[in-house]
Amino acid sequence: MTNIRITEVFTQAMPVLEKLEEAGFEAYFVGGCVRDLLLERPIHDVDIATSAYPEEVKETFAKSIDTGIQHGTVTVLYGGSSYEITTFRTESGYQDFRRPDKVTFVQNLDEDLKRRDFTINALAMNRQGEIIDLFDGLGDLKRRVIKAVGVAEDRFHEDALRMMRAVRFMSQLSFSLEEKTRQAIINNHELLSKISVERIREEFVKLALGKDSRQAFKDFLATGLSEECPGLAGKKDQLSVLTDLKAGPDDEAVFWSLIAVLINLPADKISPFMRAWKNSNAMNQQVRQIVAAFDLLSRGEESDFDLFEIGQENLEAALKLAGLLGKPLSSQVLLDRYNRLPIKAAGELAIDGQWLIKEGIKPSPELGQLLRKALEGVVSGQVENSQAAIAEFLAI
């Protein structure tokens, strides 16, 4: 056991452990919150494991929510905060390679820690600040390695998503893969196809936005995980660029745009690709716009009206994408051009459809054409943005 200084987020949760212990149960902080405490990373919430059964947890606290009671998890509302409290448990029979067919509540912390994915996540801490470490997770933290608890192949057969979690943790923590764990991913990467795309996407994006994504992408490709992801099979050569980036993406839409460019997706194939990854319609649309803007800017043929239509957010994203790919676009020049535009949105135009109707233009295709002409004229600097100037420009 190792003693460490307990920080504020744990101090605030300490009365929860005390209350469980006063009721005659064991209780510990477990998992990622303990890992992040030791790594001095930001901690937003804590997970608590206890020997108390769910019904006993509910009897101990006045306010609780059955968030996952069939798996032993109760959310307790205490002291103005909410805490997930899970009964010590073992799991068995993972027929779908994700969720256990059977959960058995136990009274032993050791048995609970054995079911966890990686040694650095199989740490527990009592309210005295003592660390319980059954699998040398502390040593692996010092060595900065991701190592499966026990037999790696067994852990990945229990939950195939753990293979993606392994490379995601590599990226977020700047850790490396322990060799047996790495080999187990190589041997079992096909199991990832059993996992829902939504869960894979969540890990994939976290990997991409992590501080050390380059090394993580190397193992994502080398272990074969990429072959089980939508639209990425057979694309290792194109995706290898991800392992050589000077800096990784810091924005999800830019990341997806980067993938689309690297695997040479035609414009009409971006939407099917994004849908295959179960991305939102908003993300789909944004990525299509960023890639289109990047393509246009790369050709160097953009007009002021093109910049207006691209808009500031997508312009900045396209320039980020160009930077990641090492494309020599004149970012500041383009941003300065955009900032000098007379207007930045159609709503800033001095006229609208109602004004044109008042001027005698009937609702018709002509009305839309006149609005477009006025917009292009103002943006390009051909005409001042005033009703009188636009009326003269349109000859109405």
From Swiss-Prot:
Broad EC category: transferase
Q: Which GO terms describe its biological process?
A: RNA repair; tRNA 3'-terminal CCA addition
Sequence positions that bind Mg(2+) = 45, 47
Q: At which positions is CTP bound?
A: 32, 35, 116, 159, 162, 165, 168
Q: Does the keyword Nucleotidyltransferase apply?
A: yes
Q: Which reaction does it catalyse?
A: a tRNA precursor + 2 CTP + ATP = a tRNA with a 3' CCA end + 3 diphosphate; a tRNA with a 3' CCA end + 2 CTP + ATP = a tRNA with a 3' CCACCA end + 3 diphosphate
User: What CDD domains is this protein classified in?
Assistant: NT_ClassII-CCAase (cd05398)
- A GO molecular-function descriptor: CCA tRNA nucleotidyltransferase activity
Cofactor(s) needed, names only, are: Mg(2+)
Q: Does the keyword Transport apply?
A: no
Signal peptide location in the record? none
Instruction: Specify the superkingdom.
Output: Bacteria
The record's annotation in Gene3D superfamilies points to: 1.10.110.30, 1.10.246.80, 1.20.58.560, Beta Polymerase, domain 2
Report the EC number(s), separated by commas if there are several: 2.7.7.72
Q: Per UniProt, where does ATP bind?
A: 32, 35, 116, 159, 162, 165, 168
Record's miscellaneous remark:
A single active site specifically recognizes both ATP and CTP and is responsible for their addition.
**What does this protein do, in the record's words?**
Catalyzes the addition and repair of the essential 3'-terminal CCA sequence in tRNAs without using a nucleic acid template. Adds these three nucleotides in the order of C, C, and A to the tRNA nucleotide-73, using CTP and ATP as substrates and producing inorganic pyrophosphate. tRNA 3'-terminal CCA addition is required both for tRNA processing and repair. Also involved in tRNA surveillance by mediating tandem CCA addition to generate a CCACCA at the 3' terminus of unstable tRNAs. While stable tRNAs receive only 3'-terminal CCA, unstable tRNAs are marked with CCACCA and rapidly degraded.
| Subunit organization | Homodimer.
Q: Which family does it belong to?
A: Belongs to the tRNA nucleotidyltransferase/poly(A) polymerase family. Bacterial CCA-adding enzyme type 3 subfamily.
Q: Which NCBIfam families does the UniProt entry name for this protein?
A: PRK13299.1
Q: What is this protein called?
A: CCA-adding enzyme
Q: Which organism is it from?
A: Lactobacillus delbrueckii subsp. bulgaricus (strain ATCC 11842 / DSM 20081 / BCRC 10696 / JCM 1002 / NBRC 13953 / NCIMB 11778 / NCTC 12712 / WDCM 00102 / Lb 14)
The gene name on file is cca
